[in-house]
Amino acid sequence: MLSPKGAILIFFLTGFFLSIIILVLNYLLSPKSKSLIKRETYECGLETIGPTWVQFKGNYFMYALVFVLFDVETIFLYPWAVRFNVLGLFAFVEMVIFIGILVLGLWYAWKEGALEWK
């Protein structure tokens, strides 16, 4: 019988090698553009004027980061809410502290202007 550590090792190795195989297959099977005209920037059928590399401000970045933070909070809150009656007062106090830390982080992000559109 395989030990639990061996099963976890096999799981990670399988995931790693499947990822490598998929990347190699993607490289081998993807179309290759050999001609220079296929590498040119296409902009509404016209040749580009000026530099084609334009950097955009990432205004949505902070919103996405805050969303991911509170999405992960939901992942941690759900099992606690399902087993609320069984866990008792200690788990309740732990969750209040956890939510308090997250509210403190939200307040700090709000204070620093991370949630304001600029």
From Swiss-Prot:
Keywords: Cell membrane, Membrane, NAD, Quinone, Translocase, Transmembrane, Transmembrane helix, Transport
GO molecular function, one term: NADH dehydrogenase (ubiquinone) activity
Annotated TM spans: 8-28, 61-81, 86-106
Catalytic activity: a quinone + NADH + 5 H(+)(in) = a quinol + NAD(+) + 4 H(+)(out)
Superkingdom assignment: Bacteria
Major subcellular location class: membrane
Pfam families referenced in this protein's UniProt entry, alphabetically: Oxidored_q4 (PF00507)
Compartments where located: Cell membrane
Membrane topology: Multi-pass membrane protein
GO CC entries: NADH dehydrogenase complex; plasma membrane
EC number of this enzyme: 7.1.1.-
Protein family according to the UniProt entry: Belongs to the complex I subunit 3 family.
Record's subunit section: NDH-1 is composed of 14 different subunits. Subunits NuoA, H, J, K, L, M, N constitute the membrane sector of the complex.
Role of this protein: NDH-1 shuttles electrons from NADH, via FMN and iron-sulfur (Fe-S) centers, to quinones in the respiratory chain. The immediate electron acceptor for the enzyme in this species is believed to be a menaquinone. Couples the redox reaction to proton translocation (for every two electrons transferred, four hydrogen ions are translocated across the cytoplasmic membrane), and thus conserves the redox energy in a proton gradient.
Protein name: NADH-quinone oxidoreductase subunit A
Gene that encodes it: nuoA
